[in-house]
Swiss-Prot record:
Cited Pfam families: Ub-RnfH
Listed name of the protein: UPF0125 protein plu3376
HAMAP family per the UniProt record, alphabetical: UPF0125_RnfH (MF_00460)
UniProt cross-references to PANTHER family, sorted A to Z: UPF0125 PROTEIN RATB (PTHR37483:SF1)
InterPro entries noted in UniProt: Mopterin_synth/thiamin_S_b, RnfH, RnfH_sf
Biological source species: Photorhabdus laumondii subsp. laumondii (strain DSM 15139 / CIP 105565 / TT01)
Length: 97
C-alpha cells in the first residue's frame, strides 16, 4: 500500500491551523486528525461534539480518506441560524410599522 497526503484544517476568527499529514492508504478521518497533532494543540476540539467535513461535505470519524483530501474541523455555532433569522424578521417588521 502506498501513502496518501491529506490536510487537516481548523479555523478560529483570529488564527487558522493547517497541517499536512502523510498516512497509509485506507486511513480514517480520525487517524488524520490525531496524526495532525491538533488535538494536543487545541483543547477546545472535541471529536464527539465538533462536526467534521471533507471539502465541506459532512463526514464521520470512520470515513476513509483519499489522496489530497482536506479534513475540516468545524467550530460549534454560537447562535442558532433559525432563531437569528426569526429575530431579524421580527425587528424588520417592527421597524416597518
Amino acid at each position: 500500500m502506498s501513502d496518501i497526503n491529506v490536510e487537516v484544517v481548523y479555523a478560529l476568527p483570529d488564527r487558522q491551523y493547517l497541517r499536512t499529514v502523510k498516512l497509509a492508504q485506507g486511513s480514517t478521518v480520525e487517524q488524520a486528525i490525531v496524526a495532525s497533532g491538533l488535538l494536543t494543540l487545541r483543547n477546545d476540539i472535541d471529536l464527539q461534539k465538533n462536526k467534521l467535513g471533507v471539502y465541506s461535505r459532512p463526514v464521520k470519524l470512520t470515513d476513509i480518506l483519499e489522496e489530497g483530501d482536506r479534513v475540516e474541523i468545524y467550530r460549534p455555532l454560537l447562535a442558532d441560524p433559525k432563531e437569528m433569522r426569526r429575530k431579524r424578521a421580527e425587528r424588520a417588521k417592527n421597524n416597518a410599522q
